[in-house]
Amino acid sequence: MDDIYKAAVEQLTEEQKNEFKAAFDIFVLGAEDGCISTKELGKVMRMLGQNPTPEELQEMIDEVDEDGSGTVDFDEFLVMMVRCMKDDSKGKSEEELSDLFRMFDKNADGYIDLDELKMMLQATGETITEDDIEELMKDGDKNNDGRIDYDEFLEFMKGVE
């Protein structure tokens, strides 16, 4: 395994480690060796908000399952989660943000106007006031043209993460 990922594990907060441990423990119940099978690994990672493709999952497993046992212990799991978090913070998230922008941009004109923002936020089912919506629009609309373009949207969403 790469030392860079092992070093990154050391940078995880106790809260992150505890969250990962809790998820890992759910799936390790009943396992005599304290390891989870590679079949269960995808479920654990999805539970933690990661969404690796089957190919990515198999690649990660192959990299950490050095003895070919088909199981992953907690230390190996932490290294995998760090890797997944790193991958999620680039590339994929840009694609996801692009998809999200297109969802908001109902008329596909390349901008999110106040009505589109209002429609999407109300569709979430959350209680949100007109003032809240206007405040969000003001925060996102950096050039004050009354609409949010893609670059403004990216900048706004990066501040949210």
Swiss-Prot record:
Any one GO cellular component localisation term in the record: sarcomere
Keyword Metal-binding among record annotations: yes
Domain EF-hand: 16-51, 52-87, 92-127, 128-161
Protein name per its UniProtKB record: Troponin C, slow skeletal and cardiac muscles
Its job: Troponin is the central regulatory protein of striated muscle contraction. Tn consists of three components: Tn-I which is the inhibitor of actomyosin ATPase, Tn-T which contains the binding site for tropomyosin and Tn-C. The binding of calcium to Tn-C abolishes the inhibitory action of Tn on actin filaments.
InterPro entries assigned to the protein according to its UniProt record, in alphabetical order: CALM/Myosin/TropC-like, EF-hand-dom_pair, EF_Hand_1_Ca_BS, EF_hand_dom
SMART domains to which the protein is assigned, alphabetical: EFh (SM00054)
Domain of life according to the entry: Eukaryota
Residues reported in the UniProt entry to bind Ca(2+) 3: 141, 143, 145, 147, 152
Binding site for Ca(2+) 2: 105, 107, 109, 111, 116
Gene: Tnnc1
One GO molecular-function entry: troponin T binding
Note: Cardiac muscle Tn-C can bind 3 calcium ions per molecule. Domain I does not bind calcium.
Residues bearing the modification N-acetylmethionine: 1
Family: Belongs to the troponin C family.
Positions of modified residues (Phosphoserine): 98
Amino-acid positions noted as binding Ca(2+) 1 in the UniProt annotation, renumbered to this chain: 65, 67, 69, 71, 76
Pfam families: EF-hand_7, EF-hand_8
SS bond partners: none
GO biological process: cardiac muscle contraction; diaphragm contraction; muscle filament sliding; regulation of ATP-dependent activity; regulation of muscle filament sliding speed; response to metal ion; transition between fast and slow fiber; ventricular cardiac muscle tissue morphogenesis
Signal peptide extent: none
Annotated keywords: Acetylation, Calcium, Metal-binding, Muscle protein, Phosphoprotein, Repeat
